[in-house]
Amino acid sequence: MKLPITDKNKILTLIPQRTPIVMVDALWEYTPTEGVAGLTVVPSNLFVQQGVFLESGLIEHIAQSIALHKGYYYYLNGKPAPMGYIGAIKKIEIQSLPKVGDTLKTHITIQQEFMDVTLVTMQTFVGDTLIAQGEMKTVLAPNP
């Protein structure tokens, strides 16, 4: 799979989430410590109300951007995408909420990894406008 990845079926092989909770539709860039994921907000999105993408959807999109980055890493290493969880949101600042038709680009940077816990900083843009930023810890579920 070569970047950018915008095919919905390919994205689904990289993340554990399934419709209607899928909040990423593109992986634009990838390095082992950074990535850029995207989402175009559509009217049928579970987190859209009155044409606005809600805070909870934005946070879920950010978490799934991290999951997509991790899933691509596992794909490159010939392993299935693991299940993960938001461990903690250390801080998040939301300057504005996107609207239907907006395309989100979330830049993630891995700050630290220890065992199955990853500390990530993130910034989400619509065009050149920063709409959200913060830090999040994610935790991988143990393999069954």
PLM features: residue spans?
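A conserved, well-ordered hydrophobic junction motif at loop->secondary-structure transitions
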Residues: T40-Y74
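HotDog/MaoC-like acyl-thioester-processing domains
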Residues: V36, L68, K99-D102, T109-P144
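Hydrophobic residues on conserved beta-strands that form the core of alpha/beta folds
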Residues: V24-D25, I89, L119, Q133
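Short aromatic-glycine motifs in intrinsically disordered, low-complexity regions
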Residues: K8-R18
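Catalytic strand-loop segment that frames the active site of acyl-thioester-processing enzymes
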Residues: T19-L54
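Conserved positions in beta-strands of structured domains
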Residues: D25-W28, K90, Q95, T109-Q111
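Hydrophobic beta-strand-centered segment that forms part of the acyl-chain substrate-binding groove
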Residues: L3-I5, L68-K105
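Hydrophobic core residues within well-ordered beta-strands of beta-rich domains
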Residues: I21-M23, L104, T118
